[in-house]
Amino acid sequence: MRTAVLFACVTILPAGLAAQPASSLSADVREFVQVDAPVVALTHVQVVDGTGAPAASDQTIVLRAGRIAAVGPSDTVAVPGGAEVLDLTGHTVIPGFIGLHDHTFYMTRGRRVQLNFSAPRLYLASGVTTIRTTGAFSPYSELNLKSSIATGELVGPRMYITGPYITGAGASTQMKAVSSPEDARRVVAYWAEEGVDWFKAYTRIGHDELAAAIDEAHKLGLKVTGHLGVVTYSEAAEMGIDSLEHGLYA
């Protein structure tokens, strides 16, 4: 039997654009739109809902204005009149994945390349419909990419942007080194104003600087993660850090 996996709503419109009419999208984005209808029914599919429950067979999903309006056994879900009906017998539908540690750049020895064209498309092709970038070498590229996706100019997942790596002296020239708590607060306040959602502390950041960055971010309603080295996990936890990435090294 022919089988395939469909990621919920990706076959209809890219993530974040589902409520927009196709006519409002750029020509490049419209190429990814296979179905342009206000009401769509995906019938006779197998559904994996992401809760840990067993897969449910012969289900029907009704999408209205890009949102899931109903899910259930095909013999109980009423398909609205005028809906575009796709018989997807033999296919499986799962929720789009949320990536919590993602990048839009690629690193080789001595070289880092920003992938504003390919990265968002590859995330969607992998079923990832929302990403959190986790440290940026080009924060403005990512902020502009997020905006272009949200307005329908470019195709890609919904994005939550982490600002530049915040670290201490001796780090990569593409990271922001801070030398005092006041400096850390200033960096956080600046990038918060520019529109980032998270901050990432890196291995060389000191104790006082990390504590100040976390405090300032929390005052502004934002969060901090860290790939730490000088500061230990338990010390960062006591400071109130929101997340931790990778292993520990200096």
Predicted feature descriptions by range:
Residues 4-18:
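Bacterial N-terminal signal peptides
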Residues 20-26, 40:
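N-terminal amphipathic/hydrophobic interface segments
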Residues 24-27, 32-34, 47, 52-94:
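Histidine-rich, glycine-flanked metal-binding segment
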Residues 28, 88-105, 115-228, 232-250:
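Divalent-metal coordination cores built from histidine and acidic residues
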Residues 41, 83-87, 161:
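Conserved beta-strand scaffold positions in the cores of enzyme catalytic domains, especially
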